Structure formats: structure tokens, C-alpha cells
């Protein structure tokens, strides 16, 4: 059955493949997986129907109650890694977000612990603006076509919902100070002088950090509309 008993009793997945890039611009493809330390526990159809008739917010409530009681839920983070030359060794496209990388070893990266509930739901939850375009140096979007669309559409949606300066809000703001030529716009809380709001520019000293190199993928061929050849549907 597919209805989680609570959010603390379910796993999480990146769905899409991403790239991890080193200082030389070399990259590998990765998928991330959050494994619930509490284990997975789902409701039957009858249980889900009865419970959700009384409390449609049961999964959120169960998670918050666990935290309130001091039983802090945990998830282990795992990563699967494929080298670029391995992509064509499968009978499906590993960049297809509907596919699981069965047989590819998982490596544990760490553990996430939720040790408190939001002190202010609006400030810490409703204002949160998640988007797959919010990537730190060293992680890039793969060529997954669905992900490429989401990189634009999610950021655009959050810009419409929260505003062009959503990344200035404490819940979205990076830990390290952002130095860029972005300025102004509705609800701007930053302090800027000057009028240069683009990059590159010879009028200001702000430049891209050369130590963070993007990966390069050589391409050759023709654009076309064609059926997907390696589908492996329903497996």
C-alpha cells in the first residue's frame, strides 16, 4: 500500500539524477536516497480511508508529535554513482526519472535528524521556496529533460508565489553571504549602492569565482522528434 502512516515512516528520493563535479570539471551522475531509520510503515486502503476521514493532516501531525515527544526522527542519506561511460550499459535510460538504478551500490553520506518543530509555521514553512535550481557549487542538473524543465519552472513559480527576493528571507537565505549584482525588486531588504544589475560588467569588481568550474558535455547529432527506444516500461 502507498499511504504512509506518517512522514517519519517513509523514505525519500531525489527522483532525478544529478551531476557531481570536481575542481577539474570532471563529473559523475548521482541519485540520492533518504532511508527512514524508523523504517517504512504504510496504511492499508481501509485504514487510510478511516484515518483520513477523521484527520486529513495525519502524516504531518504524526511527525510533529514524534518531535514534541523527543523521539527525533532520522533519515540516512545514501548516494548512487554512475560514471558517464556507464549510462549506455543499461537496457533503459538511467536519466529517465521513472527508473530505479537497481544493482548500483549505495554509499552512506550521513544522517539527518529533525530535532524541533517550526517556531513559526508561516516564517519557517510557508515561506520556504524549494527549487532544483538552488544548487551549491559541485552539484549540477543532469540532462534529464524533466529536470531541465523543473530547473526553470520551480524557480519561476516560487518567484511568483513568494517574490523576486525570496532568497533574502531567513528560511531561504544561504549560510554564506551572497555577493552578486542582483538588486531592487519588490520586498527587497538588501542594502546596495550603484546601478549595475547585470554581469559581467567592467564597472564593478564582482566576478564569477573561477575555482568553481561547470562540467562540459560534447554533443553531436541532429535535433528530432522520435519515439524513446529504451523504455523498459513497468519494470
What are the residue ranges of the model-derived segments?
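Active-site-adjacent core segments of small-molecule enzymes
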Residues: 1-235
Amino acid at each position: 500500500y502507498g499511504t504512509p502512516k506518517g512522514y517519519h515512516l517513509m523514505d525519500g528520493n531525489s527522483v532525478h539524477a544529478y551531476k557531481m563535479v570536481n575542481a577539474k570539471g570532471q563529473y559523475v551522475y548521482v541519485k540520492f536516497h533518504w532511508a527512514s531509520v524508523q523504517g517504512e510503515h504504510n496504511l492499508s486502503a481501509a485504514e487510510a480511508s478511516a484515518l483520513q476521514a477523521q484527520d486529513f493532516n495525519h502524516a504531518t501531525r504524526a511527525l510533529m508529535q514524534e518531535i514534541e515527544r523527543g523521539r527525533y526522527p532520522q533519515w540516512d542519506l545514501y548516494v548512487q554513482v554512475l560514471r558517464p561511460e556507464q549510462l549506455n550499459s543499461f537496457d533503459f535510460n538511467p536519466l529517465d526519472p521513472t527508473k530505479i538504478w537497481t544493482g548500483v551500490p549505495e554509499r552512506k553520506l550521513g544522517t539527518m535528524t529533525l530535532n524541533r518543530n517550526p517556531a513559526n509555521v508561516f516564517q519557517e514553512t510557508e515561506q520556504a521556496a524549494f527549487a532544483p535550481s538552488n544548487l551549491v557549487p559541485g552539484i549540477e542538473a543532469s540532462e534529464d529533460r524533466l529536470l531541465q524543465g523543473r530547473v526553470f519552472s520551480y524557480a519561476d513559480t516560487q518567484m511568483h508565489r513568494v517574490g523576486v527576493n525570496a532568497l533574502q528571507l531567513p528560511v531561504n537565505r544561504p549560510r554564506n553571504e551572497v555577493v552578486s549584482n542582483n538588486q531592487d525588486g519588490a520586498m527587497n531588504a538588501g542594502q546596495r549602492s550603484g546601478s549595475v544589475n547585470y554581469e559581467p560588467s567592467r564597472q564593478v569588481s564582482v566576478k564569477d569565482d573561477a575555482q568553481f568550474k561547470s562540467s562540459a558535455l560534447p554533443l553531436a547529432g541532429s535535433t528530432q522528434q522520435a519515439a524513446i527506444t529504451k523504455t523498459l516500461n513497468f519494470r
